[in-house]
Swiss-Prot record:
Protein family according to the UniProt entry: Belongs to the UPF0312 family. Type 1 subfamily.
Record bears the keyword Signal: yes
HAMAP family: UPF0312
Organism whose genome encodes this protein: Vibrio cholerae serotype O1 (strain ATCC 39541 / Classical Ogawa 395 / O395)
GO CC terms of this entry: periplasmic space
A Pfam family it matches: YceI
Source domain of life: Bacteria
Stated name of the protein: UPF0312 protein VC0395_0473/VC395_A0785
Length: 189
């Protein structure tokens, strides 16, 4: 009788699908599967686009409990690249982001809100130009699964608008803000 109860109990436990747990990921910058891009208005006539070439970070994601998710990203502001060396030098200067003095920008999430259908609201603190301010990133879960090398990956995209004055950065020409576009693919630890 004991053996029968144990067998039934074991069978019941094995047949229950395991709930997804939070998984920790490293942002895949080595494989160039992530990017931090920006767009700023140029003189009211067009947009300048660029990116930050050096950054790192990690995130925790639990599809069964989105609120338990978190993200931390560190950006080397000296790696700003708008595909124009003289302009990059000027943007990195004390006139704007002062990358020699403030070489790292950091984002740390404080809350992740599930908006439904893969849409997320990632709230957190951004430290840029020596100022820490709360921001919201509107994000989208792209997908997750096994990669061809036997690892697990998860990917997200997001956007946010940063008001330059909030971070003590002077207005760049016609634009008082910069739009950020983020693409993140993580490799599970």
């Amino acid at each position: 009788m004991k053996k029968t109860l144990m067998a039934v109990g074991l069978a019941a436990v094995i047949s229950i699908p395991f709930a997804a747990n939070a998984a920790d990921y490293v942002i895949d910058t080595k494989g160039a599967h992530a990017s931090i891009n920006f767009k700023v208005n140029h003189l009211g006539y067009s947009y300048i686009k660029g990116r930050f070439n050096k950054f790192d970070g990690e995130f925790s994601y639990d599809p069964a409990n989105i609120a338990a998710s978190s993200v931390v990203v560190n950006v080397d502001t000296r790696s700003l690249d708008s595909n124009h060396a003289e302009r990059d030098k000027h943007i990195r200067s004390a006139d704007f982001i002062d990358a020699s003095k403030y070489s790292t920008a950091t984002f740390k999430s404080t809350e992740v809100v599930d908006k439904g259908n893969g849409q997320l609201e990632v709230k957190g603190d951004l430290t840029l130009h020596g100022q820490t301010k709360p921001i919201v990133i509107n994000a989208e879960f792209i997908g997750a699964g096994q990669d061809p090398w036997g690892g697990q990956r998860a990917g997200f995209a997001g956007t946010t608008r940063l008001e330059l004055k909030d971070f003590g950065i002077q207005v760049m020409g016609a634009s008082s803000y910069v739009d950020m576009e983020l693409h993140v693919e993580g490799v599970q630890k």
